[in-house]
Amino acid sequence: MPGDRLIAIGGHRVGRNVSPHELLINQAGSDVLLTFMKMDGTLRSVTIKALYDESRARYREWVERNRQIVHEATQGRVRYLHIPDMQAHGYAEFHRGFLAGVVYEGLIVDLRYNTGGFVSPLIVEKLARKRLGYGVSRWGEPEPYPPESVMGPMVAITNEAAGSDGDIISHVFKMMKLGPLIGKRTWGGVIGIYPRDTLIDGGVTTQPEFSFWSAESGWQLENRGVEPDIEVEMRPQDYVGGVDPQLERAIAEVLRLMQDHAPKLPDFSERPRLPLPEEG
């Protein structure tokens, strides 16, 4: 609970010279007894199964916190989604946020820390869909045409830790003018490798075999990266203070775009009543 203090792990006290990490060595997958002191001084013990890796849990917490920040700052009008890579995990995360996001008035696409892969064409195809109309049935809700098309404006956030296919999708988002690109210049590493050769000791060699060319940048994405439309720095004190000026600027930009180009669902209360065709 908030305010509880961890004082012991497995019966051993946590202190200035004994960290929780030290007491959790070799405990992954095992049941571990944790003892907490509550704010009123009483003790509470729980048994948990220690994880091998907490990065997925920390990632989910970060994404959900960002989503909550966006939801509260926009009164529920804007959807936030993060794409961690351009492989299976990133493709799943994209659809987790995007399919629920097409009904919102605005969309923030977070490409920061994207480690690359190969599925950016599939994601760009979805982001580039323009809502042209609606399919309206007699009883059901109106469905956007084309399906899974974004209702309102989009903005994207990127940074210096987005690379490879993360570079490429940042570049294409900007090149196709899907919305403003906010943050810092990307990593600039679009030459791909292929781990095809295994060594006798179990190691693997890789060699550069792929690159990227576009009509706008030519070959210059490598070693240069993608310049954002709006540069916003993340300072060390921002990390320490839990402040995200890049996300704050993205929220401000998408709200501005929504004000200038307000998305609006047409009024379908009056359905067409066409007469029967005349004979002859």
Task: Indicate residue ranges for each PLM-predicted region.
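In a subset of proteins, long, contiguous C-terminal domains/tails are tracked
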Residues: 103-105, 134, 214-280
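Metal-dependent DNA phosphodiester-chemistry modules and their immediately adjacent helices/loops
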Residues: 68-69, 162-164, 199-231
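Cleft-lining beta-strand/loop regions that shape enzyme active-site pockets
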Residues: 2, 7-203, 238-243, 252-260, ...
